[in-house]
Every structure is written in structure tokens, then in C-alpha cells.
Amino acid sequence: MRESMRIELELQTDNFTVIPYNHQYYLASAIYNKIHSANPAYAKRLHNYQKFKFFTFSLLQIRKRVIRKEGIETIDGKAYLYISSPNNEFIENFVAGLLEDGKLRVGNVEFFVRKAKILPIPKKFNILKTISPIYLKTMIETEDGLKTYDLLPNNSKFYENLKNNLKKKYEAFYNEKCDMNFEFEVLKFRPKRMRIKNDIYCRCSEMVFKVWGDYDLIKFGYECGFGEKNSMGFGMVVNVEDKNQKNKKLKTKI
């Protein structure tokens, strides 16, 4: 299996452009469009694989911003996007599509790609922080039958599902049984209600959490995302090097 890769894109649009809060669907569409432009056969294969896609991406990270009712206003028009996958074929095709015109359209907003940078994979993990929220669900029995219930860290099922989900993705990607394990402790979390597309909403969690256990399994979560719906922009994390980060207020970019 090929080496993993994570990239940072520095994007530029007009000053004072307003970005919608729920822009994950637009980003997912933009990513697929770029891949399809570069390699239609790979894009079709990726789209048709129903179980796991093995990539994730962040929400747009807008550092100079004003929060408006209709969305986030970019003061200087600059935003950052992070994309990660355990398979370079995905990243290579996305970058190839991006190089065709150097643009990325997010809904009605057109960004120009100013810079693209490959980021190194950390040698160790301790504290992780989400840059797109983690989504998990379970099924519960009701009088009307089985219903989908979105999980947050205040439910013990959240912890079980997060670990099991990561191991299942690892087994599917490497086509081998995963005997590795990891544990985690949630240091801070903030519940979010996000619109996936149209009128479909979900409850998810922005988190800072401590991890320990088998490095390769944690690294795989870092590469392809923790939790479900990674390919829709959920579950991307960054490694927090500052050991005092857990005592700081959790700042949300979106």
C-alpha cells in the first residue's frame, strides 16, 4: 500500500467574501470534481465504493473573519483547507485536477490556490484537536421501530463506536485483521448541528482529546479521519504539540 499524505492548501478569494457555515457538501463536491477531471475512472471507482472512502478534509480555516448571520466573512479573502488520505493515489489525482486551472469552487465562491504544501505525519500522538467535527451514530429501538441516534461524548456508546469504526476502516483498507487498539479521553467537546446537504442535519462534536495505544492505528485515524462520514468532511484532526493545550479554551474556526 502506498504512503499516506496530508496537504495544506492556501486559498484566496475576494476580500469580505461570505462563506456559508455549512459548506462541507460544497467542499466534497469540489474535491470529487477535481478528481473526476484528472482521472474519471478513479473518480467513478471512488464514488461507487459505498462503505469507506478513506479520505477526509477540514472545514475551511478562516483566520481573519467576522461572524455574520448568513455566514463567515473573510476579511482578507484567505482560507486554508486540509486534505488527508492513507492512499497517495487519492491525493495525487486531486492535485492533478487542481493543477489544471488552479481554482476551487465552494458553492458560489471561487477560490484561487495560492500555495499547496505537503505536511509531515507526526512521529507521535498525544493530544488531538478536530478541524472538522466527529460524527457517530447508533440505532435505538423505539415504539416505531429502529431509529438512528447521533452520538456525542456524553454517551458511553460514543467511545465504543469510535474505536470500532476505526478498526473496521483499517481492516477494510489493508485487507487484514486489526489486532491493534487505542484509548482516548475527551478533554473538551462542543456539540454542533451541521447540515450535510439540503435538509439533512446531524449532531456532531468538536473535540480536544488525548490518545494513547498503538501508533499505527492512531496514525490511520489521523490520515483518514475519526468517526463516520469522513469523505463528507467529518473527523479530521490535528496533532497538538503544546502540552498545555488541554487547559486552553477550545476555539472553533466555524
Curated annotation (Swiss-Prot):
- EC number annotated for this UniProt entry: 3.1.-.-
Question: Site: Transition state stabilizer. Where?
Answer: 53
Q: List the GO molecular function terms.
A: endonuclease activity; RNA binding
What CDD domains does its record include? Cas6_I-A (cd09759)
User: Top-level EC class, please?
Assistant: hydrolase
Q: Which Gene Ontology BP terms does the record give?
A: defense response to virus
Give the keywords, sorted. Answer: Antiviral defense, Endonuclease, Hydrolase, Nuclease, RNA-binding
Matches recorded under InterPro entries: Cas_Cas6_C, CRISPR-assoc_prot_Cas6, CRISPR-assoc_prot_Cas6_N_sf
Q: State a single Pfam family of this protein.
A: Cas_Cas6_C
**Catalytic residue positions:** 32, 47
**PANTHER family in the record:** CRISPR-ASSOCIATED ENDORIBONUCLEASE CAS6 1
Similarity field: Belongs to the CRISPR-associated protein Cas6/Cse3/CasE family.
Q: What role does this protein play? A: CRISPR (clustered regularly interspaced short palindromic repeat) is an adaptive immune system that provides protection against mobile genetic elements (viruses, transposable elements and conjugative plasmids). CRISPR clusters contain sequences complementary to antecedent mobile elements and target invading nucleic acids. CRISPR clusters are transcribed and processed into CRISPR RNA (crRNA). This protein processes pre-crRNA into individual crRNA units.
The name this protein goes by in its record: CRISPR-associated endoribonuclease Cas6 1
Species this chain originates from: Methanocaldococcus jannaschii (strain ATCC 43067 / DSM 2661 / JAL-1 / JCM 10045 / NBRC 100440)
Q: Species lineage, top-down?
A: Archaea, Methanobacteriati, Methanobacteriota, Methanomada group, Methanococci
